[in-house]
Amino acid sequence: MNQVEMTEFPVGKPEEALYGVASTPDGALWFTLAKGNAIGRLSPDGEVSRFPLPHADGQPTTITCGPDGRPWFTLSSANAVGRLSPDGALRMFELPRPASRPFGIAAGHDGCLWFAEMAGDRIGRITIDGDIEEYDLPVKGGYPSCMAAGRDGLMWFTLNQAGAIGSISATAAPRIFPLGAADAAPVGIASDAQGALWIAQAGNGAIARFDAGGRITEFPLHSRAARPHALAADAAGNLWFTEWGANRIGRISEAGDTAGYELAAPGSEPHGIAIDPHGCVWAALETGSLVRLQASPRD
């Protein structure tokens, strides 16, 4: 692959805990400030906008582009899902049951958003009009974390404390699939073009592949302490991920070949990751910047 250029764009302060990032079709990047209690937008021309949230400590975390092209996000402490319009109009949807701590969120094939309830042992589904349904999981204390839409029409999720992943749809009951490593602690999950699921295993420093036949292949990274966190798939068949514990952005091909890109500042703490419409990779650094990785021609 071509060489990679990395460019940082300061969008917040370290104490605001920049966490999630998502791209919308207009080329904008939206991000969450978990301790800054705000959602931000980086426009294609580099302008930064902020949208304060009404809760004193809502803890916005994961963010995604919804079926309507707008950013949707979870507020773990406020027990809600939010949506923003480009002009800053905010809608908040409180979850039916208290203290559910919603975290991961992803758009589904059914035109709805699906989200994981870490403390509720449930998966939620919300229409773009705000109607919410919840589905109890058969595993208690599993800590459902991140979500992804599979090529099979199902929604897939990680169970961080259960060392497993699961699938669900509005018409299919949840199914649970244990991963190979007891200490996997899966967080991020993404689907590739072949229908396989890729999982970031923060506990043992590995990326796992779960194919359509249910086979699990584990790819150890350079260090068990790398703590891979979020995952995103690009159009070329690569999976990109943040290495929270190693201060790197990683890449793995569908064949399992890996590469890593060191971040410029020590202790950047990369978390969320997204691919923009031009194929550039963006990651959210807790130190307050979005970093863009883009291919450059070889010398």
From Swiss-Prot:
Protein name: Virginiamycin B lyase
Taxonomic placement: Bacteria, Pseudomonadati, Pseudomonadota, Betaproteobacteria, Burkholderiales
Metal-binding listed as a keyword: yes
GO MF annotation: an example: magnesium ion binding
Keyword terms: Antibiotic resistance, Lyase, Magnesium, Metal-binding
The keyword Disulfide bond is annotated on this UniProt entry: no
Cofactor(s) it depends on: Mg(2+)
One Pfam family per UniProt: Vgb_lyase
InterPro entries, alphabetized: Streptogrm_lyase, Vgb, WD40/YVTN_repeat-like_dom_sf
Residues annotated for Mg(2+) binding in this entry: 269, 286
GO biological-process terms attached to the record: antibiotic catabolic process; response to antibiotic
Function: Inactivates the type B streptogramin antibiotics by linearizing the lactone ring at the ester linkage, generating a free phenylglycine carboxylate and converting the threonyl moiety into 2-amino-butenoic acid.
Enzyme active site: 271 (proton acceptor)
Subunit structure: Monomer.
EC number: 4.2.99.-
GO cellular component, one term: outer membrane-bounded periplasmic space
Family per record: Belongs to the Vgb family.
Residues that bind substrate: 229
